[in-house]
Amino acid sequence: MTKRILVAVDGSEEAVNAARFAASEWPDAEITLLHVINPADSTTGAEGGFPGAVDQWYENARNRGERLLSEAAAAVDADVDTRLELGRPTATILDVANGDVDDDADPFDHVVLASQGRTGLSRVVLGSVAEGVVRRADMPVTVVR
């Protein structure tokens, strides 16, 4: 029986649909929505090389992540937990899923994520995140289209 579900959320409607799917498929499970802030994104903005820019970028990314999680949680017809982490998306999703981030955390039973939540280059990146999670996860993974 699936008890703990981790759903990766990137702000796309597809990711929100993945969260809705998880809530409807496993109504009695503990669902956690996870958004990963990718530090590699900090060097892609126009302000990338200025002093203090990384701190400002991180604050903006954290605020955006909290907003995305709040919006996704509100869109799901279930009680869900939210979690915000900093790291490379694939590795961080897997670490959280395996319970490797917190010393006292149990592993999740299942991971749910969207196949491709964005367009253009970010679509390729998200697709590679989904593929990486599917290939390396120690637990079942559901990819929602």
Which residue ranges define each predicted feature?
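Structural beta-alpha unit
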Residues: 74-111, 136-139
